[in-house]
A protein has these predicted regions:
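Residue(s) in the substrate-gating loop at a strand-loop-helix junction
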Residues: 113
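Active-site loop-to-helix junction immediately N-terminal to the catalytic Tyr of the SDR YXXXK motif
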Residues: 72, 119-127, 139
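The beta1-alpha1 cofactor-binding region of Rossmann-like NAD(H)/NADP(H)-dependent oxidoreductases
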Residues: 30-41, 74, 211-212
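Substrate-binding pocket helix/loop in short-chain dehydrogenase/reductase
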Residues: 67-69, 73-79, 198
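Short, small/polar-rich loop/turn modules that mediate ligand/substrate recognition or access, typified
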Residues: 145-149, 228-230
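Short C-terminal tail/terminal secondary-structure segment
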Residues: 63-66, 217-218, 229-245
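Active-site helix of classical SDR
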Residues: 92, 129, 137
Length: 245
């Protein structure tokens, strides 16, 4: 979390009269990704604290499962697309204003998912939103060129270290896939079981971690892949169902 990062790295000095408490190696700010004005305020605060910004990685996302009948309420469908698709667009649109003012090249990385190309039961809103996010990467790479490179990172299911997998969801998934567990089993143990189950479906048999994703983001926002734009890099351990046809 932002608090954990700033606690580890420190906030440094503040910006006098700005209301910003720190502008050292890290700064924690809140924003509603579905609200353009909220995004604008956050970006302005970042620009004030650091003199501008070079790269943005959008990791905000939400998964809303269907109910037992396979139905998802209209408001939950809209919320899923609002965060997973429209939110990324709003960030890109507002950030581009600053990038143009700076006159310097920038990088934008969106988070999509292996689910974007794998149709399956029980996650229709999420899967469709991530398919839209994949194409948003391509569209934005054209709209924001040549000043900004736009790419995506598409991980497979990340259980370890993910806020999207609280204990109750982990238990629900273990039961769904008939994976043995006990009610008094430690959450860490349950998470490892589920993570390995997903990993065993891949070619590398290795669970996907947040650190694995971070490597892909790092490559995309640095000059190591400076000629790459409009692409989605998969970090899925080799999920053959997601191979593009």
């Amino acid at each position: 979390t932002a608090d954990e990062i700033t606690a580890k790295l420190g906030q440094g000095i503040g910006v006098a009269g700005s209301g910003i408490s720190g502008c050292g190696p890290s700064i924690g700010l809140a924003a509603n990704i579905t609200d353009r004005a909220s995004i604008r305020v956050m970006l302005d605060q970042v620009a004030l604290a650091y003199g501008g910004f070079d790269s943005i990685a959008v990791t905000a996302g939400i998964f809303v499962p269907s109910d037992t009948t396979g139905h998802i309420p209209d408001d939950k469908w809209a919320l899923t697309f609002g965060i997973n698709v429209t939110g990324s667009y709003l960030v890109a649109d507002e950030a581009f204003k600053t990038w143009k003012e700076q006159g310097l090249r920038g990088n934008l990385v969106l988070t999509t998912s292996a689910n974007a190309v794998v149709a399956k039961k029980g996650s229709v809103a999420y899967d469709c939103s991530k398919a839209a996010a994949n194409h948003l990467v391509r569209e934005l790479s054209i709209e924001l060129s040549p000043l900004v490179r736009v790419n995506g990172v598409a991980p497979a299911t990340v259980v370890q270290g993910s806020a999207m997998f609280p204990r109750d969801r982990v238990i629900g998934s273990l039961a769904k896939y008939s994976i043995p567990y006990t009610d008094d089993e430690a959450t860490e143990s349950l998470v490892k079981k589920l993570a390995q189950f997903y990993a065993d479906r891949t070619l590398t048999k290795s669970p996907i971690t947040p650190a694995d994703q971070a490597e892909a983001y790092f490559l995309l926002v640095t000059n190591r892949l400076s000629k790459t734009t409009g692409q989605v890099i998969t970090v899925d351990g080799g999920l053959h169902e997601a191979f593009l046809r």
